[in-house]
Amino acid sequence: MSIEVSNESGMDISEPELISVARFVIARMDVHPAAELSMVLVDSATMADLHVRWMDLPGPTDVMSFPMDELEPGGRPDSPEPGPSMLGDIVLCPSFAADQADKAGHSLAHELALLTVHGVLHLLGYDHAEPEEEKEMFGLQNSLLEEWYEDLRRIDREAALAERDQKLLGKTGFVDGVDR
């Protein structure tokens, strides 16, 4: 799975975190492992231009998704085909997202993770134009985001235990005599 991030926003954003959440969602949604995703972070003016050009709506927005192939929600796992080689592009506007994060009372990092999940789901064919679609998509979005956070906590716990074990074993000399 290849995920490329291009930060043209002028803001300091954790690209590895965006890649992590995108990779998690793509894997959890059973997208073929050869799939590729491109993410671009832009400033408000660029996002406003894209928003008018593609959605005919004024002003910037938080996230836009540009799928390469039309996919049906939930259609990927049962598909006999290996899946698209390129899922598409996600465009994020960190400055717009920062305002949303402030209003929601959480961090910009959390907002960008949420928007990344949202963008990937759009690439996979999910939408929220109708109330039932919105309920399904936002429920899945929140569930995936929470699963990703739990996965990060698990990884942190395992790393802390491994570090503790390394210190304990290193002090007793067990590690020094073991072939690696």
Curated annotation (Swiss-Prot):
One GO process term, biological-process aspect: rRNA processing
Localization per record: Cytoplasm
PROSITE patterns: UPF0054
Cofactor remark from the record: Binds 1 zinc ion.
Binding site for Zn(2+): 118, 122, 128
InterPro entries, sorted: MetalPrtase_cat_dom_sf_prd (IPR023091), YbeY (IPR002036), YbeY_CS (IPR020549)
Keywords, comma-separated and alphabetical: Cytoplasm, Endonuclease, Hydrolase, Metal-binding, Nuclease, Ribosome biogenesis, rRNA processing, Zinc
Origin superkingdom: Bacteria
GO MF entry, a single one: zinc ion binding
Cofactor(s) demanded: Zn(2+)
Record Gene3D superfamilies: Metalloproteases ('zincins'), catalytic domain
Enzyme Commission numbers on file: 3.1.-.-
EC top class named in words: hydrolase
GO cellular component: cytoplasm
Function text: Single strand-specific metallo-endoribonuclease involved in late-stage 70S ribosome quality control and in maturation of the 3' terminus of the 16S rRNA.
Family: Belongs to the endoribonuclease YbeY family.
Designated name of the protein: Endoribonuclease YbeY
Protein's organism: Rhodococcus erythropolis (strain PR4 / NBRC 100887)
